[in-house]
C-alpha cells in the first residue's frame, strides 16, 4: 500500500469529519495482499440477502466464489476474503441485479464488475511530485472545453494515440495547447459512462458521455486497453501530469444530477429509490431531462458527492469542477462542496450550469440556480445573459442578436462585461434574462459565447446571419465577414470581467456542419478540423494574441465587484450630435495605477456593418487592437476625443 496516501488520507479525515463518515460509507473494497474487505451500504436489504460474487474476468464467465455478506449495524454489510485477490473482479447483489457498488474505484470492461487493484500500482513515475499549476484568482483562468476524442481522433491530427488520454501527453499536443495560451482544460465527461460499448472500439462510436455509470472511474474507451482496470487509471493520471507540467489545469465535468438510467444504476441496485427524487404523485422527477434526477439534499447523496469530489482531487489531482445542470442540486450541498474544497485548496475552481432541464421535485429557492448564485460564495455560473446577447436566443438557432447587427441587447452585454455584478450603469430592466444581479464578484461569472451544447459558434453565426451563407456574395467576402464577427465575439468574452471560456477548436473556426447538438454524431461531425489551421491561420493568431492580452493585463481580470465598479465605466453611445447609436458598446478601465502597466484602457465593440464614431475621454492613445489585429506594442496612435471603429470589430486603446 502507498504509505504516503494513507498518511494524507488520515490527515484529511482528521480535518474533515463529514468526509471521514463518507469514507466509511463508500469505501466498498479495501485491498491488501493478505486479505480484501468488502463493505456495502444497503440499508433496505433484508436479512442475509446481500451477496458478493468473485470473478476471474471483468466481463465473461461465472463467479468462482459466492459469499453471503454479514450485517454490520443497521445499514452496512461486510465480508472478508483471505488471500491476494489483486486482478480479480467482484459484484454485489441485494436482489436487484449485480452491481460493482456505488463507489467502485476500478472496473472491468464496460464497468459492470468492480476490479480489485492496488491504486499505488496505477501511479505513473513522478506522480508523487505532480504539482497543481498556480493561479492567483479564478479570473486568471482561460478555460478550454474539450472532448478527449474530438481533439485527436482525426488522422490529420498527426497524433499517435488518436481518441485517447495519451494523445494529450504527446509533445505535439502539449505544444499546441501551450502556444494557444489556455491554462485550464474542462474535459467533457471522463468518468465511466454507459453510452459507448468498450468491447466494440474497433467500430467508430461517439458520445459526449453525459450518461453516468461509475462516477469514480475514468472512462475506458479513452484508454489503450479498457479490459485492463489499471490502464485507464494510469493513463488518465499520465495525461493530468503532462498537462500540469505544461501549466494547464484539469477541470472535471461532474454529472451528479442524473444517472444513465434508474433500474440499471448502481444507486438503484444498492439502495432502491433513495438517491432519486420523486414527484408528489410518486413518479420519478426529471429535472435533468434524462429520465431522472438525483436527490442531493438527502444525506447519503450529499455525502456521495462530497466524497467523490474529494476522491478526484486526491487520487487524480483534479484542479476544478464544472457541475452539469447545477440547478438540479440544492444550495446547501453545493456550498458544502465549496467549503470542503476550500480546506483542501481554495484555488480549485467550482462552477456550473445555473439551470435545470426541467422542473425539479424540490423548491426552486433552495436550488443552485443562477438566480441564487449570490448565495453560493465562490461558485461560478455560466452567463447565458452574455451568450445570448451576442449570438441570439437559445430557443432559436436562426435568430441573431448583436453579432448579427440587431439592436436591443446592449444592456445584456454590459451586464456580462461587468461580470454579472450590480453596476450603476447597467439597466437591469433591459437585461434579457435576469432582472437582478446574480454574482457577488465577477469571478462567479463564466463569460462565453458558445460551448458543446447547441450549435458551435461558426455554425450559429452562419445560421443566424444571412450574409454568411449568401451565395451571391463571394466566398472570400463571406469568409472575411465570418472572421470579423468571430473575432469580435471572442474579444467581448476576453475583455469582459469574469472567467473566460471557449469551446475547443473555435480558434481554428471549427464547425459541426450545422448540427445543433452533436452528442452522438459521428467523428466526421465532432472531430477537430486540423486543416483549418492552414486555411485560417489568422484565426488562431488572433485567439492566441487575445488570450495573451488578457493574461498580460490584470485590468481585464478584476477579482471583486467593488474593483469593477471603481475602475470600469461605460462610455456614452451617442455620436457628436447627441444621437443615440445602437449596436455600439464601449467602456473605459480607468485609474489603473498599481494595477496594470496600462493606466487607462478604452474598449469599443462595433456590431454594425458600417464604421461608427464614438466619443472617448480626450487624450493621446496607443492602438492595441483594430480591424482584427492585436499588437500590444502598438498598431498606431490616436489623439482627440472621438474615434472611428471599423465595422464588425473591436477597438482597444491604452495610455501608459
List the predicted regions and their residue ranges.
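Bacterial Sec-dependent N-terminal signal peptides
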Residues: 1-24
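The feature marks proteins involved in alpha-glucan
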Residues: 23-37, 68-145, 150-163
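Carbohydrate-binding surface patches
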Residues: 34-44, 570-617
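Conserved, mostly hydrophobic/aromatic
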Residues: 40, 92, 146, 187, ...
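Beta-strand-rich binding/interaction modules
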Residues: 40, 46-59, 63, 611-628
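C-terminal beta-strand-rich structural cap/linker in extracellular carbohydrate-active enzymes
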Residues: 42, 86-90, 635-656
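Conserved alpha/beta catalytic core and glycan-binding cleft of carbohydrate-active enzymes
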Residues: 114-117, 121, 338-339, 347-509, ...
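Substrate-binding/active-site clefts of carbohydrate-active enzymes
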Residues: 147-171, 175-316, 329-345, 349, ...
